[in-house]
Amino acid sequence: MASGILLNVKEEVTCPICLELLTEPLSLHCGHSFCQACITANHKKSMLYKEGERSCPVCRISYQPENIQPNRHVANIVEKLREVKLSPEEGQKVDHCARHGEKLLLFCQEDSKVICWLCERSQEHRGHHTFLMEEVAQEYHVKLQTALEMLRQKQQEAEKLEADIREEKASWKIQIDHDKTNVLADFEQLREILDREESNELQNLEKEEEDILKSLTKSETKMVQQTQYVRELISDLEHRLQGSMMELLQGVDGIIKRIENMTLKKPKTFHKNQRRVFRAPDLKGMLDMFRELTDVRRCWVDVTLAPNNISHVVIAEDKRQVSSRNPQIMYRTQGTLFQSLTNFIYCTGILGSQSITSGKHYWEVDVSKKSAWILGVCAGFQPDAMYNIEQNENYQPKYGYWVIGLQEGVKYSVFQDGSSHTPFAPFIVPLSVIICPDRVGVFVDYEACTVSFFNITNHGFLIYKFSQCSFSKPVFPYLNPRKCTVPMTLCSPSS
């Protein structure tokens, strides 16, 4: 009953033109009410086609624009009606139009809305393409099914993107944490260097202070004695001048001669411009070296030793460690027993299993506690040739060796090409190594044709760098423990 009354009221406040609830209702003197926009549009049409005649769209009674009045009473009814819901039963009827109460049987293609027949005739949907729901339901069902499959694919892509970004986030965190650790370690090394340099400088200054002040104290004592002696002479002369004639003349020539011949001794002094000038450590150079070492360490490769049949060396099971046997090896050739300690250096040379034909490669070798070793890169050698007695002279770049070495525990050297007078003898150049390395880093840049050696023990300082290397064929890591039985160890990248 109540819903019927509401429907009747709704009909009374519905615009006859747009068939919607009145919006800003205006009433003509004939009593009919219209939306302000609808009656204005109707007025414009009347002016265009009927030569200025204005008439009510419902009853066709003429009207004048000044007779149009806002209908606030109807506006209030419309406002209240919009707030009022129909009965619960009617509200649950989703197949009926909420505006007109008619069955929702049509589909408006332009607005993608289900509408009733009154909606179809309204201003909102006028001129639109409308269809029975049954005509388009199957078509849109297929489209929605296709869209659903597309969404499921998008969901998989989205989940993969989500997983990828999480993985990247975790990777970045690990990398940054690793970089933080490296930064802390690098600056700790810098602090160690600065502390050591500071301690050395202070010790030098204390020694300098002790030596100089000790010498100046001795000079000061002599100067005090000399001053006292002069004062005593002055006192003696003053006494003679004030005394009797006999006291004045007694031994006067000797005193005058002694004064005339007296020469003041000057103290031993130290010229300040001769002092050793203190220079702060080259922090920029240190940082540059740290950066260089950090860069090359990004090219760290996991090097292992190649298997071999050399009886004079022992390779560990993990193929990372090599050591020499007792060098007093006896060789038997054609029934003759002879000792070849010279050839032993080359007989203990071992190649890494990884060949280098391009790119950048870095590895580190632990040589702690060894008194002799040779390491670097080699362009490969024939095992049979190692027994050639002349090969102990072929550690030269032109023969495919870019190596440095240690002998007698303190003598570091680099093997360079020999002169034209001694082409088969390498030119052995001593290296200045302040801190003996327990670990040596080797960096090969194949395209740049360089081989660099770093003292990892001394904060990554560069030991030596070969430039313009002639890499005409693959090169290999090279280790030679020489006659020292202490092992050499290839370090893993994680060490």
UniProtKB/Swiss-Prot annotation:
TM annotation in the entry: none
Main enzyme class: transferase
Residues the entry annotates as binding Zn(2+): C97, H100, C119, H125
Protein encoded by which gene: TRIM5
Name under which the protein is recorded: Tripartite motif-containing protein 5
Residue ranges occupied by any B30.2/SPRY domain in the UniProt entry: 283-495
Organism: Macaca nemestrina (Pig-tailed macaque)
GO molecular function: pattern recognition receptor activity; ubiquitin-protein transferase activity; zinc ion binding
InterPro entries reported in the protein's UniProt record: B30.2/SPRY, B30.2/SPRY_sf, Butyrophylin_SPRY, ConA-like_dom_sf, SPRY_dom, TRIM/RBCC, Znf-RING_euk, Znf_B-box
Catalytic activity: S-ubiquitinyl-[E2 ubiquitin-conjugating enzyme]-L-cysteine + [acceptor protein]-L-lysine = [E2 ubiquitin-conjugating enzyme]-L-cysteine + N(6)-ubiquitinyl-[acceptor protein]-L-lysine
Zinc finger (B box-type): 92-133
Pathway(s) the chain acts in: Protein modification; protein ubiquitination
Keyword annotations: Acetylation, Antiviral defense, Autophagy, Coiled coil, Cytoplasm, Immunity, Innate immunity, Metal-binding, Nucleus, Phosphoprotein, Transferase, Ubl conjugation, Ubl conjugation pathway, Zinc, Zinc-finger
Single Gene Ontology BP annotation: innate immune response
GO cellular component terms, A-Z: nucleus; P-body
PTM comment: Degraded in a proteasome-independent fashion in the absence of viral infection but in a proteasome-dependent fashion following exposure to restriction sensitive virus.
Domain of life (superkingdom): Eukaryota
Domain remark text: The B box-type zinc finger domain and the coiled-coil domain contribute to the higher and low order multimerization respectively which is essential for restriction activity. The coiled coil domain is important for higher order multimerization by promoting the initial dimerization. The B30.2/SPRY domain acts as a capsid recognition domain. Polymorphisms in this domain explain the observed species-specific differences among orthologs.
Function: Capsid-specific restriction factor that prevents infection from non-host-adapted retroviruses. Blocks viral replication early in the life cycle, after viral entry but before reverse transcription. In addition to acting as a capsid-specific restriction factor, also acts as a pattern recognition receptor that activates innate immune signaling in response to the retroviral capsid lattice.
Keyword Metal-binding on entry: yes
Location relative to the cell: Cytoplasm; Nucleus
